[in-house]
Amino acid sequence: MNKHNSAQYGDLTVLYRPVGRIELDLIQRSGLKAFPPRLEGQPIFYPVLNEEYATFIAREWNTKDAASGYIGYVLRFSVRKDFLDHFEVQKVGSSTALEYWIPAEKLREFNENIVGVIEVIAHHQNQS
């Protein structure tokens, strides 16, 4: 673990991303290798640094959002550390609310720095 609680393995950093059904479908179409382009009005891509925070978002936000299909998935993936070194970690709340802010125009380069596949490690559904 580094000072931000994300796991590092050599030159890789493990990141997480909470997503809804539509975004997961688009990721699966890439062969679980890339995130889809941001939509208009979404200038930033937000991967998070720990599973706890990703789970919170997937469970508390995605499951209450019609655009997410009322389901939240937690994804795990590895990114080359030398690419991430160009971005600062942003703390957006509690000590676990840590994320990178990747400009939409850098998402293609971000995807090129993913090593391996994007894994679905959990899902949460609206129980109401």
Feature-to-residue mapping (PLM):
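Conserved NAD+-utilizing ADP-ribose enzyme module
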Residues: 1-46, 52-128
